[in-house]
Regions:
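Bacterial N-terminal signal peptides
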Residues: 4-15
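N-terminal presequence-like segments and the immediate start of the first folded domain
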Residues: 17-71, 75-89, 93-196, 200-214, ...
Length: 408
């Protein structure tokens, strides 16, 4: 009988650990679109948090707004019974990049011990003005440590990398000379410099670029995508590249025009690229890549694949349906469903389309809604078809899903 009880206890413990759960502070208002946070076992994913207080008021100063956004992250983390020391990675979105020094200062005050890896991005518009911060927290601190390349010097209140038991989270590595603060004139040199800096963080953790499972190249209009892709493809094995979300942004810290940030897996045996049968291998991005039980999926748009592929829908809602079809192809190839998605990043051409986007988005999820970050990264463009009747992307979405969990 005792053996049966012990066995039941371990089975219950495993089930509790494996089940995905929504995380919400007691002060959080009901939300039909996303969860404030999602507990996915070893990691907690925190939705983008704005600068408003729980009562809806906006602090008076920029510095207070930055601190409040961090406090809102803290409320979600604490609702998962963790502390800010468990936060390993954050992305900070700013409408005004001149506020970056204040962001750096507040982070240094709030997270002085082992600051998380961090990427800071200038965007056109946010759901709440000023700032938005999302986060990833690790449940176990046993193997958490900061990673610094040799001779690394920086005034940043962020760790270049944070190592956990199974992953490495890499801060945004800018195409800026760290010794002089100068931005090279040649876009190709800027790309190479940013890639070299990302590589140095990996090597300081005993890893290399083969270990990357997801990369965000963030670039301004000054970096041609063709140049970025050509230099990037040289660094990775064809057909086995990391998943990727390449996002044009309005600005980056230090006057940079390119920044790489991402996630690596420590054990290469835990890494596996996933590619639907209707997609050819790519020199720049795998559709999705596993890091153990976690699936990182590239940003997808409403692009119809195939010989005559392109974006043919002319509204955000219609494009999103094709985006979800594309992401479902990825998930099904990994033998997963939308119900195992724990976090999404949504990039809209025009944030005023968010309601139309949401009305379609929620139809694809049952039970626990994923954590979510939503931004308008650059000013809206013209919504006109080209000579082939292709429309510009009005939305993009990347996602993270966790296998062997259920959120029903």
């Amino acid at each position: 009988m005792r053996r049966m009880l012990v066995g039941f206890f371990f089975l219950w413990t495993f089930a509790a650990h494996a089940q995905t759960r929504a995380v919400a502070p007691t002060s959080a208002a009901a939300n039909r679109i996303y969860s404030p946070g999602v507990n996915a076992g070893d990691y907690i994913y925190v939705s983008g948090q704005g600068p408003r207080k729980p009562d809806g008021t906006l602090p008076a100063t920029v510095r207070e707004q930055i601190r409040q956004a961090l406090d809102n992250v803290k409320l979600v983390v604490e609702a998962a019974h963790l502390t800010m020391e468990h936060v390993v990675y954050v992305q900070v979105y700013l409408e005004d990049m001149t506020q970056y020094p204040e962001v750096n200062g507040v982070f240094g005050e709030v997270l002085p011990k082992t600051p998380p890896a961090r990427a800071v991005l200038g965007v056109a518009k946010l759901p709440d003005p000023g700032i938005q911060i999302n986060a990833v927290a690790v449940r176990s601190l046993a193997e958490k440590r900061a990673v610094y390349p040799p001779n690394y010097k920086s005034a940043e209140s962020a760790s270049p990398g944070i190592l956990t038991g199974d992953r490495l989270f890499v801060s945004g590595m800018l195409g800026v000379d760290p010794a002089t603060g100068q931005v090279p004139d040649d876009p190709a040199d800027q790309v190479d410099l940013a890639l070299d800096r990302m590589k140095s963080v990996l090597e300081a953790a005993g890893l290399d670029l083969r270990h990357m499972v997801f990369v965000n190249p963030y670039l301004t209009e000054k970096i041609p995508t063709r140049v970025m892709n050509e230099r990037y493809a040289r660094r990775f094995e064809f057909g086995n590249t990391p998943a990727r979300a390449t996002i044009e942004v309005s600005s980056l810290p230090g006057g940079a025009h390119i920044e790489y940030t991402g996630v690596a897996v420590r054990d290469l045996k835990q890494r596996r690229a996933v590619r639907p049968k209707n997609m050819p291998p790519s020199p720049t991005a795998s559709p999705c890549v596993f890091a153990g039980n976690t699936l990182y999926c590239s940003a997808k748009s409403g692009f119809i694949p195939g010989a005559h592929g392109g974006v043919y829908a002319n509204t955000t809602a219609h494009q999103l349906r094709q985006t979800m079809r594309n992401q479902l192809d990825n998930l099904e190839e990994a033998e997963m469903t939308f119900d195992q998605v724990v976090s999404t990043n949504v990039y809209l051409d025009d944030l005023s389309d968010v309601r139309a986007f949401d009305d379609v988005y929620v139809q694809y999820f049952n039970g626990v809604l994923p954590a979510r970050t939503t931004i308008e990264q650059i000013a809206p463009g013209e919504r006109k078809p080209d000579k082939d009747d292709h429309y510009p992307d009005l939305e993009q979405m990347s996602l993270i899903a966790v296998r062997n969990t259920s959120n029903r």
